[in-house]
Swiss-Prot record:
Name of the gene: Znf414
Compositionally skewed regions (Low complexity) per UniProt: 217-228
Subcellular locations according to the entry: Nucleus
Stated name of the protein: Zinc finger protein 414
SMART domains: ZnF_C2H2 (SM00355)
Basic and acidic residues compositional bias, start-end: 203-215
Keywords for this protein: DNA-binding, Metal-binding, Nucleus, Repeat, Transcription, Transcription regulation, Zinc, Zinc-finger
């Protein structure tokens, strides 16, 4: 029975408070509402949906970010500084070290390489022809002198000639340069186009050729009616004319003439034709009692 009495007392207190202090009652819900909303919203924010910078702890985090950036820049600066410190000895010597001059008899030293390079120019000045200086030839038995080195070099070529020349193929002349050879070729070609001079009279006369005696002919010594060698223009004569038939082989009549004409007979061409026809018609002879004989004859 105690439970129903409690709500009635609560309702009475709320009514009295509402009648006595209306301003406080209106203010209390406003103050409680943000508390409830804050209590509900605090565990709900999603860190992935919205960055934490825009939550209630914004100003603190904004101050923290620049601090982290400054730390990162500081770390990078220190890293660059360490790299530069490591590369300094490779490119230039450390400060305070003097670089001595490498020329013999010079005890000077310089703090930088640039100063040393400028100092070395005093030891090795550029080559220049001094006023009044003469260059003498070093060849034996030559006392000439020249005001410049270029003239001395040009003069030295007279004493030491290179073993090189350009030879003309027409007149077999030799030249030191190809330009002089080209100039000579114009003159040499003009002379080559002109008619050659007549040869000396001693070369015109030739020794007489001794004539052969008439007995040296082999055909006359053998007593043959026809010579061994005759020109192709001569036509065959005698009884050999009907035997010369150039149709089978297409040869000229002088080539088919027999070598010895003492005994008349058919020429070699007709004999060859007769043997060829005889061999085509007759069959080859078989040996008797051979393997090709019929089986009845061997019984």
């Amino acid at each position: 029975m105690e439970e129903p009495s409690r709500p009635s007392s609560d309702t009475l207190t709320t009514v009295e408070s509402s009648s006595g202090e209306p301003d406080k009652e209106v203010a209390s819900p406003d103050g409680a509402a943000p508390a409830t909303f804050s209590s509900v919203e605090e565990p709900s924010p999603n860190p992935t949906a919205m960055p934490p910078v825009w939550d209630h702890g914004g100003p603190l985090q904004q101050v923290a970010y620049p601090a982290s950036d400054s730390c990162q820049t500081g770390s990078t600066n220190t890293g660059v500084g360490t790299n530069e410190d490591l590369r300094l000895p490779r490119r230039r010597p450390p400060p305070g070290k003097q670089i001595p001059c490498s020329s013999p008899g010079c005890c000077l030293s310089f703090p930088s390489v640039r100063d040393l390079a400028q100092h070395l120019r005093t030891h090795c000045p550029p080559t220049q022809s001094l006023e009044g200086k003469l260059f003498r030839c070093s060849a034996l038995s030559c006392t000439e002198s020249f005001p410049s080195m270029q003239e001395l070099v040009a003069h030295g070529k007279l004493h030491y000639k290179p073993n090189r020349y350009f030879k003309c193929e027409n007149c077999l002349l030799r030249f030191r340069t190809h330009r002089s050879l080209f100039k000579h070729l114009h003159v040499c070609i003009d002379h080559g186009q002109n008619p050659a001079p007549p040869p000396p009279p001693a070369l015109d006369k030739e020794p007489p050729v001794p004539e052969r005696p008439p007995e040296s002919d082999p055909s006359s010594s053998l007593g043959l009616p026809f010579p061994l060698l005759e020109p192709f223009t001569s036509a065959p004569t005698g009884p050999f004319l009907p035997y010369l038939n150039p149709a089978p082989f297409g040869l000229s009549p002088p080539r088919l003439r027999p070598f010895l004409a003492a005994t008349p007979g058919p020429p070699a061409s007709s004999t060859a034709i007769w043997k060829k026809s005889q061999g085509a018609t007759s069959s080859p002879r078989r040996p008797q009692g051979g393997s090709d004989a019929p089986s009845g004859a061997c019984r």
